[in-house]
Regions:
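Short, positively charged and aromatic/hydrophobic N-terminal segments
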Residues: 7, 12-14
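Generic alpha-helix initiation/capping and coil-helix boundary signal
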Residues: 13, 19-20
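Tandem repeat scaffolds
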Residues: 22-25, 29-159
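Acidic, Ala/Val/Gly-enriched low-complexity intrinsically disordered segments
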Residues: 3-5
Length: 159
């Protein structure tokens, strides 16, 4: 396929994928796993990026939704809980008072507010050890001192 044809196909597919993402977001907000699966998997397969832009997930419980390869841009996830998976990307989002207790996640975050994060001894943001460890990264994010200390002790990259 030529580069031009590929570009045209991407332009044609983008609105379809965004409609699917809007329906996926609505299913998550409704805590409706069957609708989530019906809307997601024909359009976006496991291992492919699920991109949410300008969505409000305030107070949502993500417990039954595997979040690997989720991308949140300009989203509100304040007071959400059971966020887990790898990798999860956050850009310019509010993720205040999120409950990560018991979570195991690799997070790539930039320009986000993570103040008030809840965590416990089981919370993991780094897998493995040494040079081969998969580490979460918080770049230019707002963190309270306690959270910053917790993440640093785990070996999370904070800039």
């Amino acid at each position: 396929m030529s580069a031009l044809a590929f570009g045209i196909n991407q332009k044609l597919l983008y609105p379809c994928i965004m409609r699917a993402t809007n329906k996926i977001a609505a299913a998550i907000r409704a805590n409706d796993l069957l609708t989530y699966q019906r809307e997601r998997y024909p359009a976006i397969q496991e291992g492919e990026t699920v991109r949410f832009t300008d969505e409000d997930f305030h107070g949502i419980d993500f417990d039954q939704f595997v979040m690997g390869f989720f991308v949140f841009q300009n989203c509100n996830l304040d007071d959400a809980k059971h966020i887990y998976g790898q990798p999860i990307y956050f850009t310019n989002s509010s993720v205040r008072n999120v409950d990560f207790r018991g979570a195991k996640a690799i997070i790539e975050a930039e320009d986000c507010d993570f103040r008030g994060m809840k965590y416990d001894r089981e919370t993991q943001f780094v897998y493995g050890s040494g040079k081969l460890a998969a580490r979460s990264r918080f770049i230019n994010c707002k963190l309270d001192d306690e959270t910053r200390n917790f993440l640093s002790q785990q070996g999370v990259e904070i800039n």
